[in-house]
């Protein structure tokens, strides 16, 4: 049911389409890869699935094979005609929308899994936007540039660990569940991709009654503004007298060594 590489290339040629550099488009053209992504998404018959950036529908068709109820979103108006021609006969509704500003209340009707192949320039802001604003999205499987995926899933002490990792941890649990090479895309990217699963927590990881989100991430952002420096240097303008002692955090440590809970203690102790 999924597109073959030849069928996708023919579809592009038939409609006079070329992948948009401005939109960071790289279409997956390998049937085994899209079925693998659908399998890793964990969706089964009857589940609600939103695919963001449906492209030409190859991954969408693999998701349909699971028996899930699939809705597709695509920002590129040039793809809408061929995409709807492929998907509407198999019961998939296609929404023309920018995922960063879309009205999700018109799309989400219950707990939903998002599956998406995301371009580099959109991946981080979009994933954070969905975590922060769309509680009905309970799970995501996103394909992103490998470095971005490692950042999403990093923990204290990891090289990729930073403010983005902590923001993801605040809302959910992330892990890299697979890698995808460049040969399965048209056009072929210069980088490897990672498949990242993010499962939303039932409640945010730090109790807002203990420390507010804005206060917490102010200290996170300030610390990682000078990530290689000790906390006493990176936070010297932010920190009040005795804050490190009250928080039980050694001021000679570096931000990349601290857990989310330790940042929360700092924010609460200020």
Where are these regions (language model features)?
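C-terminal lobe and adjacent flexible extensions of AdoMet/dcAdoMet transferase-like proteins
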Residues: 220-270
